[in-house]
């Protein structure tokens, strides 16, 4: 781990202590893995290369989905007032091309990806050939307006990646 990554990890833990601990279980969510695979299947069906899962993007997406669920809002700007691209940088991800899809209400990956496929901007983000990496997160709160909240963050840099 580089000094820069270590410093960023410490700063994120200090700045977001509850979120850092709450985010980890969702990153292993079976529906999240299904979403990653579904996005790559959709890309393959449209002649676009698959993306890898990026650890910083997974962290950012998981934090954001949990933040929306626990604080009961639905927006690309988070509860701290940061735009999505600023948030990705705060989680250690920088790329020349980046994007974000969000959804709320659907509990499963299949319903959510179908919503995104039927929305031109969300469809374009999933099929953008400049995006090589993604991170998917799903948050849930029974007391929130929508229950389930999904975030898929995309980027052009391959930073700490693995297969879905």
Region locations from a protein language model:
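Bacterial N-terminal signal peptides that target proteins for export
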Residues: 1-7
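Bacterial N-terminal signal peptides
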Residues: 8-15
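Sec/Tat signal peptide C-region and signal peptidase I cleavage site
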Residues: 16-22
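A short alpha-helix/helix-coil micro-patch that ends at or immediately precedes a cysteine
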Residues: 23-71
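Extracytoplasmic
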Residues: 30, 48, 83, 97, ...
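Short, surface-exposed glycine/acidic/tryptophan-bearing loops
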Residues: 59-107, 126-128
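Disulfide-stabilized extracellular recognition modules
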Residues: 104-164
């Amino acid at each position: 781990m580089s000094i820069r990554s270590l410093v960023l990890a410490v700063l994120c833990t200090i700045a977001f202590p509850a979120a850092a601990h709450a985010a980890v279980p969702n990153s292993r969510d079976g529906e999240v893995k299904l979403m990653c695979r579904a996005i790559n299947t959709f890309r393959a069906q449209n002649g676009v290369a698959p993306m890898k899962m990026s650890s910083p993007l997974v962290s950012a997406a998981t934090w954001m989905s949990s933040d929306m669920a626990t604080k009961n809002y639905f927006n690309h700007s988070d509860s701290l007032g940061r735009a999505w691209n600023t948030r990705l940088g705060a989680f250690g991800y920088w790329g020349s091309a980046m994007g974000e899809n969000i959804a709320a209400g659907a509990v499963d990956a299949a319903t959510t990806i179908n919503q995104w496929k039927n929305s031109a901007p969300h469809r374009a983000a999933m099929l953008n050939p400049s995006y090589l990496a993604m991170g998917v997160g799903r948050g849930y709160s029974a007391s929130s307006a929508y229950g389930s909240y999904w975030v898929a963050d995309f980027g052009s840099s391959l930073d700490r990646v693995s297969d879905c």
